[in-house]
């Protein structure tokens, strides 16, 4: 089942259920995609307007990036579910003999690495989403500036949520050096892009209250 083909109602129903997927990872990807779509909306409300003719080409370029990014995040909704399947299977492997224990450890290590790869990819996409939101807030239609702020906040939330999904998997890794490297990769993205998202929000909020 392709989770992205579900209606909003069905997706949320499955999210609330005991079903193994979607979970926090897929939900984060969807929230990130929604944030990027909001930014793209700002761009589409800006193009074709005489007032913004000077930035028309820049906005069109942003829109092209946003559309590609949204589709990437949509695909990551399903990718997260697909990554959970081998992880669940690995936990179910027998470990009664030394050979079984060794095999389970190897399979689990590979599955945990795969389960980290998707949220790290979501984080990377959300970082780009925050950059786009910053550009839309600066150059897009003032009538939709609140949506640019929302775009930044959605991508920020998805970024932080995905960092938690990295952490829950690295916590279980026996290769602590590898786990630390993945945690550091996530931490670098948080350190760089959370302040940018907050800056976009504060800028938009100040403009709306002026």
Positions of PLM-derived features:
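A structural-propensity feature for long, helix-poor, extended segments
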Residues: 50-89, 189, 196
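Preference for long, well-ordered alpha-helical segments
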Residues: 129-132, 144-204, 210
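Amphipathic, well-ordered alpha-helical segments in soluble domains
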Residues: 11, 34-41, 83, 122-132, ...
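Conserved phosphate/anionic-ligand binding catalytic regions in large, soluble enzymes, centered on
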Residues: 17-40, 144-162
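Short, hydrophobic/aliphatic alpha-helical segments
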Residues: 3-21
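Amphipathic alpha-helical interface segments
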Residues: 80, 84-153, 157
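Amphipathic alpha-helix face/heptad-repeat signature
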Residues: 30-34, 62, 69-76, 115-125, ...
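Transmembrane signal-anchor/signal-peptide helices with a preference for the extracytoplasmic
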Residues: 41-53
